[in-house]
């Protein structure tokens, strides 16, 4: 039946076009995220003060929605040098015991109703996304009244979560700034005066003065500490592995000397 075949072809084409139009926005958002450059951050897992501050920020600002269910409160307290009582009084808000996993009270089914999707667990997010991306993402929320939560994000366009650190950072908006001209990957300077050549860019992130509790420098440090904690949480044995690895390398170097002397003793008659 040609009529039935024609209808079938038409329906198939309609479905294909619908799929294309549904997928295109996702590709556009992914491309925009890839094009936005990450700000590099140096994470020092030996800086316990920074890790403690990051743990505090995580507990107070992130654990309302996000769990770290592969991490235990006791392990964090031990690794970061936090006394048990201090940990329980200031960083545990769910009634959990010190040996329990860092879960949250919010149920996934409720989260889907409230947010459209359950917020992801953040235990391994630093390994999945990378510390540079996290550092950039947490600092690039900006006001966007067209979005459900009133904010958007440069590193994650059409983000589906609020800016939970807004009271620390302040109101960040898209505004105009004088930025240095870059050509061929090189910053341009006036050949006569040596001063940077700039132009006005009206797509820059700008924090409205005196709208946040922290200065820009203080906020960047706070985010760095949070990212450091997430990096630790994603691989809590890293420092111990590095310590053991040092001893292993020293042992191998020591063993090599004796192995070489033994080899020379065995082969002296051959040569």
Named regions from a protein language model:
Residues 208-245:
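Short, aromatic-rich amphipathic segments at membrane interfaces
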Residues 1-11, 193, 199:
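Short, Lys/Arg-enriched N-terminal segments with co-localized hydrophobic residues
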Residues 26-32:
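Sec/Tat signal peptide C-region and signal peptidase I cleavage site
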């Amino acid at each position: 039946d040609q009529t039935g075949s024609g209808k079938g072809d038409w329906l198939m084409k309609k479905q294909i076009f619908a799929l294309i139009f549904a997928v295109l926005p996702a590709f556009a958002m992914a491309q925009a995220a890839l094009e936005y450059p990450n700000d590099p951050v140096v994470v020092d897992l030996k800086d316990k003060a920074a890790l403690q501050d990051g743990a505090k920020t995580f507990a107070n600002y992130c654990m309302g929605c996000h769990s770290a269910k592969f991490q235990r409160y006791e392990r964090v307290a031990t690794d970061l040098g936090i006394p048990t009582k201090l940990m329980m009084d200031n960083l545990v808000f769910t009634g959990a015991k010190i040996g329990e996993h860092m879960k949250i009270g919010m149920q996934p089914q409720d989260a889907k109703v409230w947010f459209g999707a359950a917020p992801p667990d953040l235990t391994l997010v630093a390994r999945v996304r990378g510390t540079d991306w996290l550092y950039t993402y947490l600092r690039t929320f900006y006001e966007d009244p067209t979005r459900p939560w009133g904010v958007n994000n440069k590193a994650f366009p059409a983000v589906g979560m609020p800016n939970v650190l807004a009271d620390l950072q302040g109101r960040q908006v898209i505004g105009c700034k004088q930025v240095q001209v870059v050509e061929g990957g090189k910053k341009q300077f006036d050949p006569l005066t040596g001063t940077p050549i700039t132009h006005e860019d009206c797509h820059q992130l700008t924090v409205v003065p005196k709208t946040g509790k922290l200065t820009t420098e203080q906020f960047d440090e706070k985010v760095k500490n949070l990212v450091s904690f997430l990096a630790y949480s994603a691989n809590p044995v890293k420092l111990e592995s590095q310590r053991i690895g040092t001893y292993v390398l020293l042992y191998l170097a020591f063993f090599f000397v004796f192995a070489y002397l033994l080899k020379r003793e065995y082969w002296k008659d051959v040569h």
